[in-house]
């Protein structure tokens, strides 16, 4: 799941002296480097039209060094791409786990199951690292309890709300081959498909 707001969180120090130009140049350089990392990261994320995004991922049965390396790679991609979550299928790995960020901590959840949802639901725009700039309104519960295993195969449970609750529901959808276009209203789906249609010409078969 993409984090649209992070793209706009650039602050600048203001100084009437020579320091202002130096600080401004550093900010511009950092922003440029961040954009390069984002483009490189997104080039490694499977995009709309790739058949792997429609597959239901297989349960994780082996928790080993290979899984740990995948988690590390996916976490780096998630941050570089300015995302708040990334599912294994989005990098072409048909295994049932995703990475996400919660309270400043990088986490992984394998074989996840939502065991409880709150009564309140909210419609909000969602983006996806596999769908470019497309954002569509999606209705989801605002609170969830989700259980699964960490990278070591240990049982874990998280009680989540707000953006993080939305993010884990989004990533769990990915593991079932479901995209945000499937969750939105017909008019928004039609508009999104019109934007995504050119990507189908470039998608692997």
Please give the residue ranges for each predicted region.
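Positively charged
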Residues: 1-205
């Amino acid at each position: 799941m993409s984090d649209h707001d992070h793209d706009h969180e650039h602050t600048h120090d203001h100084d009437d002296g020579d320091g202002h130009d130096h600080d401004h140049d550093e900010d511009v350089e950092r922003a440029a480097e961040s954009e390069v990392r984002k483009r490189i990261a997104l080039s490694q994320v499977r995009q709309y039209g790739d058949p792997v995004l429609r597959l239901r991922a297989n349960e994780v049965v082996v928790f080993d060094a290979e899984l740990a390396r995948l988690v590390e790679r996916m976490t780096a991609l998630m941050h570089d791409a300015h995302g708040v979550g990334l599912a294994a299928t989005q990098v072409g790995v048909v295994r049932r786990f995703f990475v996400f960020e919660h309270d400043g901590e990088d986490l992984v959840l394998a074989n996840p199951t939502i065991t409880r949802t709150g009564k309140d639901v909210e419609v909000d725009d969602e983006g996806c690292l596999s769908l470019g700039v497309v954002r569509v309104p999606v209705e989801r519960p605002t609170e969830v309890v989700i259980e699964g295993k960490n990278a070591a195969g240990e049982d874990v449970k998280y009680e989540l709300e707000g953006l993080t609750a939305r993010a884990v529901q989004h990533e769990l959808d990915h593991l079932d081959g479901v995209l945000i276009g499937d969750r939105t209203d017909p008019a928004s789906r039609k508009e999104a498909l019109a934007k995504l249609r050119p990507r189908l010409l470039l998608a692997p078969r």
